[in-house]
Amino acid sequence: MAVSNAREAAVTKSEVPMSDRLAAAFALDKVQSALPGAVPMASRPIRRIECVDVSHTGGTSTRVGMVVFEDGQPQKSDYRTHALEGEAACNGDDYAALAEWMRRRLESGPPWADLVLIDGGRGQVSAVQRIVRESNAEGLFLLAGITKARDDMGRADRRAGNVGDRIFLPGRSNPLPLRDGSAELLFLQHIRDTAHHFVIGR
């Protein structure tokens, strides 16, 4: 079985065009370069990224989807959905849903991500970080959130100069200064979009 899995992984990797693999490697390197000044532990290589998104159904059923990218490539066998029903559905509360997902993820054990990317901003990141701290799991992985710029009313701000996504880290009030259209931001957006399509398609 292990030999078969290894062979399948090798075939899958060989099917990825070299240009795509090189582009992903370049983007990963740029992500790595963007983090050290803001995150002390970011000196370790970022190879495995887990990204999570929340989907609500009428506020009574909630799913949290997780996709995994390793060395810039999707690892579909590691994709997971967590269904939250009844009281655990969190009544459409993203913060509570993400906190519950983080509890379950920590209980499931390794392999750990090098970076956990949350589809959300400061509030969502803080909700997940609280569970990490309560579980004495700080240092297992980096944590970041990706979200659209917002106006004063909380709506996605699409004015000129504010159309891109923003990357937030725990303990920082301001987003990372990533340029719109940069390789690193496009790469993280692609992973977030993959998580979004995965969870709403379940």
Task: Name each model-derived stretch.
Residues M1-R202:
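Acidic, glycine-enriched active-site microenvironments
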